């Protein structure tokens, strides 16, 4: 991203950086939607199968002391810290990459930045 900012500054006096924070981004990804988007990428079968296996038939329960809760199925969320987590989120949010001409978007996992070259920046006072 620093390289992109430097390039934009070579032809524009300012670059506005919009940082977007999606609340609970990893928790809101539905597995069925993600797998549908992965299918649209036309990846080789072994790659698709890896994702499908990772997101299919997941469940969880809580053990506290000697007690175990009811087992619940999981049909949404990406496991944070997993190798497929950041890639899965980027695939899921991939259709959010349309920006106006001249602007750039940079994403990694749930961090999204939009770079907007500008010739004038006006300070807004409260």
What are these regions (language model features)?
Residues 1-126:
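Nucleotidyl polymerases of mobile genetic elements and RNA viruses
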């Amino acid at each position: 991203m620093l390289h992109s900012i430097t390039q934009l500054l070579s032809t524009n006096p300012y670059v506005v950086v919009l940082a977007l924070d999606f609340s609970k981004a990893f928790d809101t990804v539905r597995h069925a939607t993600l797998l549908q988007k992965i299918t649209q990428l036309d990846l080789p079968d072994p790659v698709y199968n890896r994702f499908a296996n990772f997101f299919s038939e997941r469940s969880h329960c809580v053990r506290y002391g000697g007690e175990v809760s009811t087992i619940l199925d999981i049909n949404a969320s990406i496991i944070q810290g997993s190798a497929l987590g950041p890639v899965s989120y980027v695939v899921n949010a991939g259709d959010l990459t349309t920006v106006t001409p001249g602007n750039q978007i940079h994403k990694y996992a749930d961090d999204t930045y939009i770079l907007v070259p500008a010739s004038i920046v006006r300070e807004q006072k409260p």
